[in-house]
């Protein structure tokens, strides 16, 4: 079995320090947030899409350590019934484009949830109402 780690847990570390930390734990693969609502601390999607040299440098740091990207993460809700959903769709597209340029074969994503009716402005996600996300409690009460 091969293990990977989602690098968001090392958001306080620089990209190279994070890679060194992960390698010191005996892990050779990383999942990096490249879109959605994640911090994207270690994977600047816009920069990497725009600059082939940056992509080579980015991948070179992994290769120096004998590491690889197991997946790019773009968890979000592209079906969100507002401008937010459009932004998430773009984010997912950019993540998929970057994955192709980097040779990454897996993307972690969420399908998302649509509105509950034609005039909804929040996703219809009332199965999680206690603590997260905080905007769902009013929908549940409604």
Set out the residue ranges of the language-model regions:
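Glycine-rich, positively charged N-terminal anion/phosphate-binding segment
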Residues: 33, 41-63
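Extreme N-terminal starter segment of soluble prokaryotic enzymes
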Residues: 1-4
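Active-site acidic/histidine proton-transfer and metal-coordination neighborhood
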Residues: 16-17, 21, 55-68, 78-142
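Active-site beta-loop-alpha junctions enriched in small/polar residues
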Residues: 6-10, 33-37, 74-77, 112-114
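Glycine-enriched alpha-helix->loop->beta-strand junction motifs that scaffold or abut catalytic
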Residues: 25-29, 103
């Amino acid at each position: 079995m091969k293990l990977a780690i989602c690098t968001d847990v090392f958001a306080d570390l620089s990209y190279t320090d994070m890679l060194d930390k992960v390698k010191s734990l005996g892990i050779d693969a990383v999942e990096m947030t490249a879109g959605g609502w994640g911090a994207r601390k270690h994977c600047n999607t816009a920069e990497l899409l725009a600059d082939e040299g940056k992509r080579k440098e980015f991948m070179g740091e992994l290769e120096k350590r004998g590491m690889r990207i197991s997946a790019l993460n773009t968890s979000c809700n592209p079906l969100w019934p507002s401008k937010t959903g459009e932004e998430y769709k773009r984010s997912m597209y950019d993540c998929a484009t970057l994955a192709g340029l980097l040779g990454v074969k897996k993307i972690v994503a969420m399908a998302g949830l649509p509105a509950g009716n034609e005039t909804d402005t929040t996703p219809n996600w009332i199965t999680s109402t206690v603590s997260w996300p905080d905007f769902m409690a009013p929908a549940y009460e409604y």
